[in-house]
Amino acid sequence: MSQFGTTDIVSGSETPPYSGASYQDAQDDNTHPHSSDAGAEKFSAGSGSESHTESSRSDDEDSQAKTKMVDNITILKYILDSLSGRDKLAKIIKYALDILKLFIEKSKRNLTVLDPSVLTYYTKILKNLTVKVALRHPITVIKVLLLSLLRNFDKKIDFISQQLSTFRYILRFGGTPFRVCSFLGKFNKTRKCNFQIDQIKKIWFNEASLREFLDLYYGIFDELDLLYKLKIWTNKSFYSFVSRQESLAWQYDILLSLKDHWLNLQSLQKRQLELEVQLKVQNNALLLSPILMHQAHKDDGSQSPIRKQLLNDLNVNNDAEVLIHKQLKAIKDEKTLVYLDIARLSFDCMANTSDILNLKTPKGTYAVLSLGSGLTGLVKLWITTKRSLCSSKD
């Protein structure tokens, strides 16, 4: 079998990861800290600049204190308690062992190529190893023992890797019946609307239905793959078909998820630019406020209502500016998660593409790419878990 059986589905079929705070959350939640540079360049000429800077620094210190309250052991415990966390850790260990196995195989080849006599005396020395033989041929004995150790270690690594792969399949097992029920619900809705074209388009012709179909398609073949590993069925020709369809379904899901994350990134960048422009306008207005206030004292009686309202707005507290900083901080955090998702999906896409197209790649390419995917996924899960724990302590 190729490496089809070692893949894992992303997005829909994974256990949903912790979700990070989006920038919309910052509009309603005043507990999120704003960025560390907030207030550093603000309003040196305004009357509220010093108090705002002190408030910003105080919020940052509180945020750092809350973050330090969550130690790494607690975060690791929460990750291990989640299905997604166990899957990520198992994936990292499996492909790290696969890479280690490649180094062991290379070491064995180098050992036998440099000294072919090692293979000649391999069995003889292991059967008749005595102190006398070890003293007469110390170098050869050391090489034989090293080769024996590497061979045994190689077999153990291969066994552990296979068990971890099966463990990850078991973690994903059992979701197909629920996906089938979801599709039956859609069929019932279609039947109740008397198969009207507009309603059919609304129910079926959308991205959510496409993703549900891909999840169901992948889940069926993924669970059939596990049943084959457990020897529930043993048809090898059908298993080749199952492995192929499993990888194709995963590839479709990867591409769809990449598209969604790319559009999400563009939306976040657009919103970030809008907030930065808005913040710059407010900063410029506050820099002009001392001049306007000075002029207002001179001709207080001749002010128009609009000018009075403008001066009043400039003299109020900096809640709007603080809120913008919170939203910018939330967007920055959200973009970090999106970048990690894009990196993870890119690793998965390259690994799965090399497998589907049977590309001639250097040995270990699939394992290295899959390890990169697992590490980026774990980093994202670590960040979101830490944020979740910090927010729960507020």
UniProtKB/Swiss-Prot annotation:
Cytoplasmic side: 1-366
Topology in membrane: Single-pass membrane protein
Composition-biased stretches (Polar residues): 1-25
Name by which UniProt lists this protein: Peroxisomal membrane protein PEX25
GO-annotated cellular components: peroxisomal membrane; peroxisome
InterPro entries assigned: PEX11 (IPR008733)
Additional remark text: Present with 2420 molecules/cell in log phase SD medium.
Residues carrying Phosphoserine: 58, 63, 289
PANTHER family xrefs: PEROXIN 11, PEROXISOMAL BIOGENESIS FACTOR 11
Recorded name of the encoding gene: PEX25
Lumenal side: 384-394
